[in-house]
Regions:
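Amphipathic alpha-helical packing segments from all-alpha helical-bundle domains
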Residues: 152-175, 184-196, 212-220
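C-terminal peripheral helix-coil segments that are non-catalytic and often amphipathic
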Residues: 1-34, 131, 167, 171-174, ...
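Amphipathic alpha-helical segments used for helix-helix packing
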Residues: 133-152, 166, 170, 199
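Basic, helix-initiating cap at the start of DNA-binding domains
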Residues: 2-61, 68-74
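Short, structured motif recognition centered on aromatic/hydrophobic residues
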Residues: 63, 104, 139-143, 194, ...
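Helix-turn-helix
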Residues: 57-91, 95
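Hydrophobic alpha-helical connector segments
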Residues: 109-138
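Short, basic, alpha-helical segments at the C-terminal edge of helix-turn-helix-like DNA-binding modules
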Residues: 68, 97-105
Length: 244
């Protein structure tokens, strides 16, 4: 992952898959009156403030209890300005979610490419995701907990995002040497279990402890493919991969 904290950049809409995240705080409020700033700057500033406000408000209240009024108050913008940028609360949430998900996806991919063997690729990708979620508790809740509570298109988008990790795991099927082939639902079951464990920790206020799950999660993932002994050996190795 890029150096420094990604939270400010993510909340301001700055996280992109092709760009590193950098330290940043929420966008400052625009000065009142005739400021002479370019319209493009004003528009971008407003959008960033709205997304920042959504992340903060959802972290405090949860998605379902958050209203457009809460968001506009936190962003210091009018309802009219909000609807100039987003069709509704769901669209605003999805904009924030996609930026964070894209960043995590790109970071995991970059980490995995640093290793030639599939087991190490899995470990590197998972370590990168856990590190990001542990360092950004508000964004961890945004992208792992709230989509399930929100339901609808947000939950559907979250399920689609989780398929990225399913594809990473399916690449390991040639590693399987057992007599019986792996069940078709193996990867979906593994990802579902991983997500459930991560959500449990975030919901309990233990986001900062997420990286401690890495050995157990790696062992859980690799066991069906490599067998329990080899999976445990790789999971307990001290050489933790990084994406920095």
């Amino acid at each position: 992952m890029a150096k420094g904290t990604a939270k400010g950049a993510a909340k301001r809409g700055k996280i992109k898959a092709e760009e590193p995240a950098s330290p940043a705080d929420a966008s400052p409020r625009l000065p009142a009156g005739r400021h002479g700033l370019p319209r493009e700057f004003i528009t971008q500033n407003q959008r960033e403030r709205i997304i920042t406000a959504l992340v903060d408000t959802v972290a405090e209240r949860g998605y379902n209890a958050t209203t457009v009024a809460h968001i506009t108050k936190a962003a210091s913008v009018s309802r009219r300005t909000f609807y100039e940028h987003f069709a509704d609360k769901e669209a605003c949430f999805l904009a924030a979610y996609e930026m964070v998900a894209d960043h995590i996806r790109a970071s995991m991919g970059a980490a995995a490419k640093s290793f030639g063997e599939w087991p190490q690729q899995v470990r590197a990708a998972l370590a990168t995701m856990l590190r990001f979620l542990a360092s950004e508790p508000e964004l961890a809740r945004l992208c792992m907990v709230e989509p399930v509570a929100a339901g609808g298109e947000i939950a559907a988008r979250h399920r689609a995002t989780m398929q990225d990790f399913v594809r990473i795991l399916k690449a390991g099927r040639p590693e399987h040497s057992g007599e019986r082939p792996l069940p078709e639902a193996t990867e979906e079951t593994l990802v579902g279990g991983i997500v459930s464990l991560i959500v449990r920790e975030i919901s309990a206020g233990r986001s900062a402890e997420l990286e401690k799950l890495l050995p157990d999660l790696v062992e859980l993932i690799l066991s069906p493919y490599l067998g329990t002994e080899e999976a445990e050996r790789l999971a307990r190795t001290d050489a933790a991969p990084t994406a920095d």
